[in-house]
A protein has these predicted regions:
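Active-site-proximal helix-loop-helix substrate-binding element of RNase H-like nuclease domains
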Residues: 74-93, 167, 171-181, 187-251, ...
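Short, polar/flexible loop-turn hinges at active-site or ligand-entry regions and domain interfaces
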Residues: 95-101, 145, 238-244, 268
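Acidic two-metal-ion nuclease catalytic site recognized across multiple nuclease folds
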Residues: 2-8, 212-223, 234-235, 248-302
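Short, function-defining helix-loop hinge/capping sites that tune catalysis or transport
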Residues: 28-30, 134, 200-203, 258
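Short mixed-charge
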Residues: 142-185
Length: 302
């Protein structure tokens, strides 16, 4: 993984922000069955670990920043809802070593706003979640937390969560722009490393064969896995690589993925979010029908 090469920014150079976050959710989800908690966690994410890198097109890292958000991490009823809540000792160790900063949301976001101000575009592996759900909902939560109506708002959110669990959510008519991250009255061009990886790195026979040989299929068996973890395994040749699922470590590998995408895309950074990008690769069934030598390795009963 490439290390930071500088902390000085040349305005003539083009920089890009690669962001990752780890999230919990509202305390009303605690104690629910895992499938119900997952629904709420996807719809109502609260960021406790926020990290990003600033890179150039070659993947050189000019800045790495990583923050634990005190309003989420330091509140057990919220942090305990996190899928990776068992990593709490790891974060405490990072704090002791000075590898991460514990601060409030508004302080962390002020640093993020600076980073956004010097970059050409921003992205993440699954930008839809990070930029369209996690950051906006955490911003909303924090604003409500410091308002007089917080408990009333939280009760309303509990009702919303009940509808989510029961699949009775009313449709959202808010305008959605797949090319833009809007935050605090400003707009930033947005790219999605997941979709770009599927397009430029993974939609080939070599990757699909690697998926079959290593069992990288979705839970249903219908599609090939296209996660940041399997993508990094493939491009690095480190087939035993396990994603850290901590924000800054994941942002590091995503910075390498970004650099290879740009190289394959002839030095272009394509803006926008592709819906369901894993479909770009086609189904496992279709690939196996074209390559019958793999038929004995997969279950096509789906």
């Amino acid at each position: 993984m490439k290390k930071s090469v500088s902390v000085k920014f040349d305005r003539r150079r083009k920089y890009y922000l690669i962001l990752d976050c780890e999230t919990a959710t509202l305390p009303c989800a605690d104690g629910l069955p895992e499938n119900e908690k997952k629904k709420i966690a996807i719809a109502k994410p609260l960021i406790y670990d926020l990290g990003w890198t600033i890179v150039d097109k070659k993947g050189n890292i000019y800045l790495r920043e990583n923050y634990l958000i005190s309003e989420i991490f330091s509140v057990p009823s919220i942090f305990n809802t996190a899928y990776y809540a068992h990593k709490r000792p790891l974060y405490l160790e990072k704090l002791d070593k000075g590898e991460i900063v514990l601060t409030d949301w508004r302080t962390a976001v002020s640093r993020l706003e600076f980073a956004l101000s010097i970059t050409e575009a921003v992205g993440a592996y699954n930008a839809m979640f990070d930029f369209k759900k996690a950051i906006p909902f955490t911003e909303l939560y924090i604003n409500q937390l410091y308002s007089a109506d917080f408990h009333k708002w939280l009760s309303f959110q509990a009702e919303c969560c009940e509808r989510i669990v029961n699949d009775t959510v009313i449709g959202n008519n808010k305008e959605f722009d797949p090319n833009c991250f809007r935050f605090r009255s400003k707009e930033y061009p947005l790219f999605d490393l997941w979709g770009l990886s599927c397009q430029y790195l993974l939609d080939n026979d070599e990757y699909k064969k690697a998926c079959l040989l290593n069992g990288w299929q979705t839970e249903s068996g219908k599609y090939f896995k296209t996660s940041a973890e399997t993508t990094y395994r493939f491009i690095s040749g480190q087939m035993d690589f396990d994603e850290a699922h901590t924000a800054i470590d994941d942002a590091d590998i995503e910075s390498e993925i970004f650099a290879l995408i740009v190289k394959r895309a002839k030095n272009q950074v394509e803006i926008g979010i592709e819906y369901f990008p894993f479909r770009i690769l086609g189904t496992v069934r279709k690939f196996v029908c074209q390559h019958p030598e793999f038929a004995d390795m997969v279950n096509l009963e789906f």
